[in-house]
């Protein structure tokens, strides 16, 4: 019998809402568990089946922990500021706030249809002034501490978006992450956050959290700590000098030329008249490229000679000074000493321009290829014969003694570009006065509410559309001094850098959150979301958390104790002979193959990321309607390991539904008895043990496998003890909560399974008391019998002979071989 999922799911969702079943527990005597999802941006497209994978995982853990007696905080909210809503509003003439509210309502409907146990009383929305009051408050604290400052910086400007974007939002091909538009470098007044002040702590404290090693490594690389030396180079024939940071001061004897970034302050001053034109043209071209495009290792090296020379401080040799875009003004000092024999980029550059390549580490033929391994130093006077570590130490000693350099630690991490020239974001709570000073708004002036306007097109001047709203923009102080509000808004990352704190105390109008409640709930016990947020969101949130820790606002150094990245659910896609993806509506299936409708070309079927353009997005609404939410939940958890990327499959969905149908039939059709005859003892206790252990490890797929094993065992058993029927339904409940609630009541229990104590197992019943042995005559199988475990040989022989007594009639038994717990073989003549 199939159950009616639509009726059952609607019934229990109403029950949970009416009874506020998932309201966060506040019993001080219970341990706490804070399960957090990366909150979504509520797009117009709604949820796709990839979203619920992570949400189901945290929901399973939340339901499991409630049953284990924990106070569980499991909230949901909306990361609702950002470019897409604004872009949509500009394209359609709609208000981004209205569009966002509609999208949130749709997301919420979809999320509720999946039976997630969120405490909706804690819902947050980054665009709500009661929320962003505290985003702005954090900004004022950063400003007071000197961690938010204005600077004229070369930004990644995207003309089509009318805004600057952060380095992290530029793709490797030099286009914008959002929209894929060209990115150019342009100097602008910007707000910056001094994340570099926290570089060392952001690095060190990674040791304190239980995160995937791959994510930690990505953060380490992004922070990019380098230990080396600053070295001073004088420009020959002038009183000018420049500094270079190098991680390899031991290779100074091999430095044969120097390279300055095109933006370096010295370039104009040292370029000779003959080279002026070439250098100016080179700098113009470089300004059109993004940092990522400039540092792409695979691109051809380009440069321009300045006509000037530097003096190598270690041996007095003259070195030509070049300008090249592979050197960034923002890294080190915007200048490098080039050691082409032992650095890939320097070697390629030297080969293009015919510059000297002098080996200073033994090994390899540097005319043929760069040599980057270790080895004894050569051509290096007092460093000859030393290995890398010894030579670095000695070189730094020499530089410091001669006062031409010193030991230095640098970081690849840059300060965070925090302003956007757009309307749909948090206003930055700063006023610029006509006397040249700026002040932050005080707490009682917050929130500075984003004014409602239909004119949200970028101003075209590089300012945000807020610059057009003079009533809002212009202010006058009590003493008559005039001022202008800051027109830049915050990036979408602002609200998501602290939202997890607001869930703890979402309605507090006096503080970001009650310190006692923060003490009670922090850190987050499990944070689940996509690995694509490894650098941006997770690094920014850790930075803000550390600032708040220093301010005494939060009690922990780190926000998220354990992080888990779910894999991606891939859609069906098709590729042509060039490997190009073809949209599913352009594909026909015939003769057992797939063909392009327009060209007739045979196509290869292969999984790929779900996308609107490929028309392979699966909408969870359709799945819930046809199969039910419980089926979708079980299927997504059973597909494979939670962190693996796996293709979507209708067959897998049907398999999950069949399992639930079998579980329902098992409860409805089994002979359920109050007494226990012991035949299911082992499999039941194994099931409780395995499911419990696997939930702790987040091995949800193998936990479901164990539930399937139990159902199979019950179908072969004579009867199902009531205790085991109840226990099974409890184990099923985190995965398939609607049907579990229904079966729980069917078994005669009071409605509401969420807080019933989690089943326990009896260790002694995990040991099999019986074994099945085979009985053979002359090596041929004659019988299989169940006997008590560990019987003595004599007893085993006796039972074996009795079980095949008929076959032995008239035969002469020569000998009996008995192997305890395995077999009895009777040799006859």
Swiss-Prot record:
Main location: cytoplasm
Coiled-coil ranges (or none): none
Motif ('KMSKS' region): 609-613
Domain of life from the UniProt record: Bacteria
Keyword line: Aminoacyl-tRNA synthetase, ATP-binding, Cytoplasm, Ligase, Nucleotide-binding, Protein biosynthesis
Localization of this protein: Cytoplasm
Motif 'HIGH' region mapped to chain: 40-51
Any one annotated GO CC term: cytosol
Catalytic reactions of this protein: tRNA(Leu) + L-leucine + ATP = L-leucyl-tRNA(Leu) + AMP + diphosphate
Cystine crosslinks: none
Gene3D superfamilies referenced in this protein's UniProt entry, alphabetically: HUPs, Isoleucyl-tRNA Synthetase, Domain 1
EC number: 6.1.1.4
NCBIfam families in alphabetical order: leuS_bact
Similarity comment text for this entry: Belongs to the class-I aminoacyl-tRNA synthetase family.
Name by which UniProt lists this protein: Leucine--tRNA ligase
Organism: Lactococcus lactis subsp. cremoris (strain MG1363)
Gene label: leuS
